[in-house]
Amino acid sequence: MKLFGTDGIRGIVNEFLTPEIAFRLGNVLGNMVDKKIFIAKDTRASGDMLEEALVAGITSAGVDAYKCGVLTTPALALITRLENAAGVMISASHNPPEYNGLKVLMRGYKLPDDIEERIEREMEKIRYCEYKSVGKVIEYDFASEEYFEYIKKQYSFLDLSGIKLVVDVANGATYKLNPQILEYFGAKLEVVNDRPDGFNINRDCGSTHPENVKKNITGSKIAVLYDGDGDRCIFVDEKGEEFHGDKILGITAIDLKKENRLKKNNVVLTILSNMGLEEFLKNNEINVVRTKVGDRYILEEMLKNDYTLGGERSGHIIYRDKSTTGDGLITTLEVLSSLVKSGLTLHDLSNRIPDYPQVMVNVEVKNKEIYKNKKVFSLMKSIKDYRVIIRPSGTEPVIRVLVEGPDLEKITDIANKFYELIKELDKE
């Protein structure tokens, strides 16, 4: 059974992701590093169980486990970079509460595929240290403070005193720290979905459910919505319209270029990024590179070619001069900084970037390899003047079909044809 997917080990708790897996991962990591390992988690009820198993595995290999408590993925990434250490984030990001995950970080970065494959092989055996060398468990209470101080230094110029902001923290890892930091910069906040109970993370809230926050938008208010582990965000503008990752990339790329922060005058997108964004960037003399879907592939391209900015429509945006990973809070501050400098409304900024209609359908299947079927390829070849992208989910039993083009009715019809075909093939 393959454990690592597109974003670490992730699945339904006690069906796929068990305490034994957490223990084995901790034991392997403890045998790979020679100092300490930092652990953080989001607000899922299963986080405590997985944390204790992970700690047992780490300490059984003779390494100290530093428990950071509830913390965002980007904050943990910063801690591991500052401490030159490894870390494990216990979170399933935007997935519902019955899911959880284990994401390994090394000096701020996610692991490359070959290291994950090595870890997975090593997890088949357990290696204990001698009893005198068992690691210690340390409650690391300074993680939030270290992250807060870092953000304050990076954005010391920022004044958000004119901003009225609804903040949806998704009952997740951002529920305390992000509002505190935004208030520090002067924004007037209305915080929602900030009472996690272990079972309500991402439940009809956060970046995957903007429809509920739209009801709170009145007057000059705007909203920012985070996911469960805080590595991404989207906005809702004054008109109640979504300001998603493509819009974020377009607007902030212009400012990064003006500030000489946009290395090689290039932005990294994915195959799902809207053609309207690409046109906007090229019209502003900014080059574009596309990668596979997933922030890990965006980051790989950025590191390989020394680019500063990359991201995807879902709100995973990487500002590599500020962070080693997607960071919802840094994204928020970059967008609000652009908003303040422009003197415009968020809606006005949004309208600068064309957005071709897109329809995405998620097809639940038993066999995710169905998308390679010849009949699917034949239908794709028959589609002219519209963009069709079909790919399996890395974390769910789902095939995703994206259709993009100028006519909404037409792309909806195309998407439905693929849905019906894949469903029919999955029955065979």
From Swiss-Prot:
Q: What does this protein do?
A: Catalyzes the conversion of glucosamine-6-phosphate to glucosamine-1-phosphate.
Q: How is the cofactor bound?
A: Binds 1 Mg(2+) ion per subunit.
| Keyword entries, A-Z | Isomerase, Magnesium, Metal-binding, Phosphoprotein
Q: Please state what the protein is called.
A: Phosphoglucosamine mutase
User: What's a GO cellular component annotated to this UniProt protein?
Assistant: cytosol
Q: What species does this protein belong to?
A: Thermosipho melanesiensis (strain DSM 12029 / CIP 104789 / BI429)
Q: What is the lineage of its organism?
A: Bacteria, Thermotogati, Thermotogota, Thermotogae, Thermotogales
Q: What is its EC number?
A: 5.4.2.10
SUPFAM superfamilies attached here?
Phosphoglucomutase, C-terminal domain (SSF55957), Phosphoglucomutase, first 3 domains (SSF53738)
Mind telling me how this protein is modified after translation? Answer: Activated by phosphorylation.
- According to its UniProt record, this protein's enzyme class is isomerase
Cite the HAMAP family for this sequence: GlmM_B (MF_01554_B)
Q: Which residues bind Mg(2+)?
A: 93, 227, 229, 231
Q: Which reaction does it catalyse?
A: alpha-D-glucosamine 1-phosphate = D-glucosamine 6-phosphate
Q: Which residues form the active site?
A: 93 (phosphoserine intermediate)
Q: Name one Pfam family in it.
A: PGM_PMM_II
Record's keyword annotation contains Metal-binding: yes
- Required cofactor(s): Mg(2+)
Q: Name one GO molecular function term.
A: phosphoglucosamine mutase activity
Question: NCBIfam families given for it?
Answer: glmM
Residues the record lists as Phosphoserine modifications: 93
